[in-house]
């Protein structure tokens, strides 16, 4: 059993990945819905990733940070994320600065969260909203 605390971007991805690997997963979120900060990121437009190569992305971090991030970025890179969103009905586009956003439309950040919610449900993650964890 894997317990993920927090239903933000990192928590949703961690819960989905663990469930995809065959683990029973419960995700605890204090709010009444998942992805509260994702929904407001980028003014509601939701910068989901960067279009650069893994090498380019890692170059933006210190060597120690890069060593920490490298395995994760190679296991699930920006192209995989964009493909996952596309299959969920959210097309993305890279801007000149390399930032990747859902194609402009009202509620694009909420659409990104909806894709993750569907993935979590399909993977069998036990979602428990309104569950504050203390201690």
Predicted segments, located by residue:
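Short N-terminal binding/cap micro-motifs at the start of the first secondary-structure element
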Residues: 11-13, 34-37
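A generic secondary-structure micro-motif detector
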Residues: 4, 70-71, 105-106
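N-terminal Rossmann-like FAD-binding beta1-loop-alpha1 element of flavoenzymes
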Residues: 1-27
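Short, conserved beta-strand segments within well-ordered enzyme catalytic domains
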Residues: 27, 39, 47-49, 126-128
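Glycine-rich active-site loop/strand segments that organize a redox cofactor
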Residues: 45-96
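Feature captures the FAD/FMN-dependent oxidoreductase FAD-binding
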Residues: 75-135
């Amino acid at each position: 059993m894997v317990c993920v605390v927090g239903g933000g971007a990192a928590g949703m991805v961690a819960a989905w990945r663990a469930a995809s690997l065959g683990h029973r997963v419960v995700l605890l979120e204090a709010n009444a819905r998942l992805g509260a900060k994702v929904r407001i990121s980028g003014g509601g437009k939701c910068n989901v990733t960067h279009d650069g190569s893994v090498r380019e992305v890692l170059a933006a971090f210190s060597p120690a940070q890069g060593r920490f991030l490298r395995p994760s970025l190679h296991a699930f890179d920006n192209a995989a994320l964009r493909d996952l969103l596309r299959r969920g009905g959210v097309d993305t586009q890279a801007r000149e600065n390399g930032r990747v956003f859902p194609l402009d439309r009202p509620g694009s950040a909420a659409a990104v969260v909806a894709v993750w919610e569907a993935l979590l449900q399909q993977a069998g993650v036990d979602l428990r909203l309104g569950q504050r964890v203390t201690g």
